A protein has these predicted regions:
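Glycine-rich, basic loop-to-helix element that forms the pyrophosphate-binding segment
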Residues: 64-80, 101, 155-159
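A recurrent flexible, glycine/aromatic-enriched loop bordering the glycosyltransferase active site
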Residues: 120, 141-162, 166, 175-180, ...
Length: 186
């Protein structure tokens, strides 16, 4: 049976953030997904963090020379088994029930690509919330990062993006550019 979801997490020098992300994945109620962590030439590797979750998650850790986020995402997708690949930045923390909500929505309305808003964690200080707002405001992101559920046109953002594997392959993956590498998905 094919895995339904593969989480792809490129990481560069963020072991603490990866720990928080993996912890959030252990709290998902939908099981049977895999996690592909791609270490992109870090000086602060997260191998030990990944090993800590090996009994709770189907996790695969890869260490490779630095090539940037796009190429690291492609590297992870090449090794993934999922029908859908969900690309997450290493500092993402998923809410409990994230994957159940994704599965429910895909059952209700099948889609080739999906994404989600980001929001400040309730524990953030006022300064952290202000920074988060400035980065997720409707005025700077077209609404999706500020919590709006629907847009007239969907522009997935690679920090929290799911895409059907066959569509990803048709697009040829991410560009090798170091910034703006997700432009082909817009």
């Amino acid at each position: 049976m094919m895995t339904r979801f593969s989480f792809i997490v490129p990481v560069f020098n963020r072991p603490d953030e990866v720990d928080e992300l993996l912890q959030s994945l252990t709290r998902q109620t939908v099981r049977g997904f895999e996690v592909i962590v791609v270490e992109d030439g870090s000086q602060m590797p997260c191998r030990d963090v990944c090993e800590k979750y090996a009994s709770q998650l189907d996790i695969h850790y890869f260490d490779k020379p630095n090539s940037g986020p796009g190429q690291s995402r492609n590297y992870g997708v090449e090794r993934a088994q999922g029908e859908y690949v969900i690309i997450l930045d290493s500092d993402v923390v998923l809410p409990d029930g994230y994957l159940a909500a994704v599965e429910q929505e895909l059952q209700r309305e099948p889609a080739d690509a999906f994404g989600g808003p980001d929001s400040a964690h309730p524990s953030f200080t006022p300064t952290q919330k202000a920074i988060s707002y400035s980065m997720t405001s409707f005025f700077t992101t077209g609404g999706i990062r500020g919590g709006k559920k629907k847009l007239d046109k969907f522009y997935p953002r690679s920090f929290n993006m799911g895409i059907r594997r066959e569509v990803y392959e048709q697009l040829g993956g991410f560009s090798s550019m170091r910034f703006g590498e997700d432009i082909d998905f817009s």
